[in-house]
Amino acid sequence: MEGQPKLLLSPPQIKIALERLACQLLERHLDFSETVLIGLQPRGIAVLQRLQHILSEQYHLQNIATGKLDITFFRDDFRRNDTPHRASSTELEAPIEGKKVVLIDDVLYTGRSIRAALTAIDSYGRPSEIELLTLIDRRFSRHLPIQPDYVGRQVDALQNDKVTVNWKELHGEDAVYLIKDTHE
């Protein structure tokens, strides 16, 4: 059973976090000529699109190479569920060989999705460097030694609690919620 959602980030707080993340990317990657930003399907895509919009509108950076990476068949729990996973498409606008790649997701939890992304990205080339950007870092929940390079907000939550990210385009509001597990 789940408890009442607790608001962790409001729309203005999400906006500030995304703008800060965009600035950090800009500091590290300058004109992005050697960088490919890749959102993990499905939930990292909204973060990628928001960052791309900020970089385009506020910093006039056009033609940033982006991509969408599906990790469905690379997950270690792929065959463990009764219901089949629904795969999304992988779309890379530019080759990643020798480029700096920034993997983007909404919530970093156990690290298993990122491990799957690292395996999946090998199918498309060998980047010179891979970084990780996440809007929310559940820092004490890792099963694997994976740490983000860019973090919007760190959240401490119990193992069975859920952190959900809502986007205006998909859910009618920008918000991040913590939903406590009320099982005893």
For each predicted feature, which ranges?
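PRPP-associated nucleotide enzymes
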Residues: 1-184
